[in-house]
Amino acid sequence: MKKITVLHLDDCPYCHNAKRAVEELKAENLEYAKLDIEWIEESRQPELAKPYGKDYYYVPSIFIDGQKVYEAHPGESYEECLAAVEKAFKVACS
């Protein structure tokens, strides 16, 4: 399986949606439950977030093997987030 990295902020509502989507998808799918996800809180772990800095603006952003596969956008619904996280999981499992 491929390495998944999620850049997020603790107080970001879109990041809470992404965490909820991850939990929901992992509970529904055994293959997704096996995925190892590195969560980087960019305000507390700037040294870990820095290598990704030029590749994203909004959080949450999901990277698979260093390539951005998802970046939230203002006004995004939970359903959009869920679909994007599931798409990222499918890429990670392929």
What do these predicted ranges mean?
Residues 49-55:
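Charged, often glycine-rich, active-site loop that binds/positions anionic groups
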Residues 32-47:
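Thiol-based oxidoreductase modules, predominantly thioredoxin-like and allied folds used
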Residues 1-5, 30-36, 93:
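Extracytoplasmic thiol/disulfide redox context detector
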Residues 1-28:
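Local sequence-structure signature of Cys/Sec-based thiol-disulfide redox active-site neighborhoods
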Residues 4-6, 37, 62-64, 85:
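Hydrophobic beta-strand residues in large extracellular and virion-surface proteins
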Residues 58, 64-94:
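Non-catalytic, surface beta->alpha helical segment in thiol-disulfide oxidoreductase systems
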Residues 18-22, 30, 64, 78-79:
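Non-catalytic interaction surface on structured domains
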Residues 13, 44, 76:
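Short alpha-helical
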